[in-house]
């Protein structure tokens, strides 16, 4: 599969941001909002954002594929967070200082425990070999998704370790105007990050599946390139998001030549998300799920088995797919 950057750290905004003392439209009970100014950030300029590949920011939960127990595994995002005492000290420090980087963390004592199999995200900053928390006091990381995991049941529904495959949504290889849902070898996704989207993820902004027949799949980061973007100016991007069909997305992620990822979210521009009608739901989708090459039968309740029963079917949009079969 074509590979762009992977999400292994918090992505900065393409613009310099400012905090406004107004209720957040993104997070309930948050008494402030983070808005973009008209100034491009130094990080974006240093990464040569003008020559970056612009892609759709897909709204789900971040995942990672890397080896575990001698085979490719799906990993779920799990950030190490400070315990109550350390969090209290950190917030008190932030009220008196501007730079979170000046806070002294004791990584042995200040953080809540995580499973032994937890690993830190690859690109986070380290000091003396130990991961350094980000500006929110979190250490981004990953835990493997075990088969039949209750905590990560929606993650485990989109992979089969027995057959080494994942349920993936991407453009149809022969027609970029059509989406395709297919079984992709996990080995092809090694060291990539992906977004898990679906019925029970992040409020289901794409209207996928139903409570009775939940539907989830993985989308590789960078899978949906954005064409014909306007110039990198605040008002031009605002008009693009508001005024064209392609702009009905959560945001944009720029994949820069040095591997850096830069983003802008609709909320940075004071715009609403989710939307009643998204660009992702404007494209037809084909199911490509012929499982005949696998010797053993799939569990009849698995998504792979259910999709195999509608193999080769074409739907007008993602939200039209039903697994009531």
From Swiss-Prot:
GO terms for biological process: hematopoietic progenitor cell differentiation; response to reactive oxygen species; RNA repair. Its EC number is 6.5.1.3. This is RNA ligase 1. Disulfide bonds: none annotated. One of its GO terms (molecular function) is RNA ligase (ATP) activity. Coiled coil: none annotated. It comes from the Eukaryota. AMPylates itself (auto-AMPylation). InterPro entries: RLIG1. Its cofactor is Mg(2+); Mn(2+). PANTHER family: CHROMOSOME 28 C12ORF29 HOMOLOG (PTHR31219), RNA LIGASE 1 (PTHR31219:SF2). The keyword Iron-sulfur does not apply. Functions as an RNA ligase, in vitro. The ligation reaction entails three nucleotidyl transfer steps. In the first step, the RNA ligase reacts with ATP in the absence of nucleic acid to form a covalent ligase-AMP intermediate and release pyrophosphate. In step 2, the ligase-AMP binds to the nucleic acid and transfers the adenylate to the 5'-PO4 terminus to form an adenylylated intermediate. In step 3, the RNA ligase directs the attack of the 3'-OH on the 5'-phosphoanhydride linkage, resulting in a repaired 3'-5' phosphodiester and release of AMP. Keywords: ATP-binding, Ligase, Nucleotide-binding, RNA repair.
């Amino acid at each position: 599969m074509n590979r762009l950057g992977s999400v292994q750290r918090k992505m900065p905004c393409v613009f310099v941001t400012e905090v406004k003392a107004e209720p957040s439209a993104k997070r309930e009970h948050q008494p402030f909002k983070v808005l973009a100014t008209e100034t491009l950030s130094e990080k974006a300029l240093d990464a040569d954002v003008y020559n970056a590949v612009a892609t759709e920011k897909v709204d789900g939960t971040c995942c990672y594929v890397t080896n575990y127990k001698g085979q490719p595994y799906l990993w779920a995002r799990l950030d190490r967070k400070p315990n109550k005492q350390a969090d209290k000290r950190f917030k008190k420090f932030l009220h008196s200082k501007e730079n979170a980087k000046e806070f002294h963390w004791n990584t042995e004592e200040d953080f809540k425990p995580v499973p032994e199999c937890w690993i830190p995200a690859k690109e986070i900053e380290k000091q003396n070999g130990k991961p350094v928390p980000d500006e929110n006091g979190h250490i981004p990381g990953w835990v493997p998704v075990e088969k039949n995991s209750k905590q990560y049941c929606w993650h485990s529904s989109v992979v089969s370790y027995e057959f080494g495959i994942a349920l993936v949504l991407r453009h149809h290889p022969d027609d970029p105007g059509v989406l395709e849902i297919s079984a992709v070898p996990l080995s092809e996704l090694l060291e990539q990050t992906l977004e898990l989207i679906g019925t029970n993820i992040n409020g289901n902004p794409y209207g996928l599946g139903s409570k009775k027949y939940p539907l989830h799949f993985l989308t590789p980061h960078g899978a949906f390139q954005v064409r014909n973007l306007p110039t990198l100016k605040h008002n031009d991007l605002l008009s693009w998001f508001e005024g064209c069909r392609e702009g009905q997305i959560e945001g944009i992620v720029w994949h820069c030549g040095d591997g850096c990822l830069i983003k802008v979210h609709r909320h940075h521009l004071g715009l609403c998300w989710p939307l009643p009608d998204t660009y992702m739901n404007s494209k037809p989708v084909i199911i490509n799920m012929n499982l005949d090459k696998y010797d053993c039968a799939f569990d009849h309740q698995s998504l792979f088995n259910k999709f195999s029963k509608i193999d080769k079917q074409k739907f007008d949009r993602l939200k039209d797919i039903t697994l009531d079969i």
